[in-house]
Amino acid sequence: MNLLPKIDWGKIERFIGSLKFAVIVISLFTIGMIIGTFLESYYGTDFANRAVYKTPAFMMIQFGILLSIIFAAILRLPPKKRLYGFYTIHSGLIIIGMGSLITYVAGVDGQITLAPNEPNRQVILSKDIIKITYPTEGKQITSFLPFSAFKTSLNETYDNISIKEYIPFAEGKFAWTDPINKYPADAQIHSSKYHFKNAFAEQDLTLSIHPEAGQEFQSTLTMGPLSFNYYPASLAHCFAQNNPSKIILWNSVTAECFTPEERHLVIKTTGANNRFVVLPYNNSFLTFFPDFSPFPMDTKLQTDEKSIIRAFSKKLFEEKPNLFLFGKQAAWYSKSENKWVLKDLALKGASVTLPWMNAEITLTDHQDRLVPFNIPESTIPIQKNGSLIKGDIRAVRLEILGKEYWVTNYSPLSLLIQGKKVVIEATKEALTLPFELAL
């Protein structure tokens, strides 16, 4: 006894190849394209792809159009001379549809950046991935993240790392967080928030030298002609010294600083009148040309960028507006007084007047140990002039040994898990070409 209903395949074939079905799928396709066009205009191409163009529903509509074309041609077989134009047009549409399907399944969708005279062979693909690297073991795990437009819950585990949530478009909510790793008690890892204003604008700034601070919290910042430079607090007293050479030497590990005058070091000049200073260090000598580079020169006159001893020439920062911040202190060069000035910044206290454009700066928050972090929150992106001005953060929430961590495209995570160093990144899949391209 046959319990399955009898299917009239001929009726299904006639319906798919009918004008009625064609009108339905083309209408749905048109509606999807209209919605996608508006989304792409306001929220960006990536959001439109995730929300409309590359969703299973929209793909099924396009597949329905392809089936409609195929069955419309089949229903008009065997060939008739008066339909040769119909067969030609529909054959072309079928070829285009099959080509689009092959491109979607086996094609590569990505971008390659070509700077002038700089060859490149790496293509950044559209697929989001989370990359877990064990540097000491030379092992790397790559997991693909869902191609979704909104927050998605996940439940994937690798070793002791659980992937809990993925947010393709997020904005950061500022918070101070505890550091992941341990640091010496005297480590210079502070961060500060300032409020800057002048006659034309005002802005809140967050600067940090904490090694765990993300890319959005740097130690340098430029606002028009004015540059902000954030340094360890222990360097402030060296800036306050108006020593004749205007050179500072410091240890980048201990953040200790001194001037050549304090160590009775002689400033010499070359035949081309370039200043240099020689520092005895660890049974050897370090030669600095501070007006050209903070790093010492070796015997082959190559800079040693691995050296922990650096030299700083204050002369280089006297012509243009440069503000040096040391947490609770600020320094700048005063042309009217012809000297460097150091001022204290009281936490949430009175503002300090700067010598440029009637500018003022106020210290609004300062943390010696905590890390500045933008906790990701799901949002709808906003596009302006071809780039995202909101929602440009891609974030993954992890759970590692009972603790919650966030990894974003701006802030990779580096920590020890049961004695093993692990680096976790949220990034895009990359493809290396077998050849180079250049402009």
What positions do the PLM features span?
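Alpha-helical transmembrane segments and their helix-start/interface "positive-inside/aromatic belt" motifs
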Residues: I7-I26, G85-L93
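Conserved structural-core and active-site-/substrate-pathway-adjacent residues in large, well-folded domains
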Residues: S18, T55, I70, S91-G92, ...
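Short, membrane-interfacial amphipathic segments enriched in basic
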Residues: M1-K6
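Internal alpha-helical transmembrane segments
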Residues: P56-D128
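Soluble non-transmembrane domains of integral membrane proteins
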Residues: I112-L439
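Membrane-embedded alpha-helical segments of integral membrane proteins
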Residues: F21-K81
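Hydrophobic, lipid-facing residues on alpha-helical transmembrane segments of integral membrane proteins
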Residues: I16, K20-V23, S27-T30, I65, ...
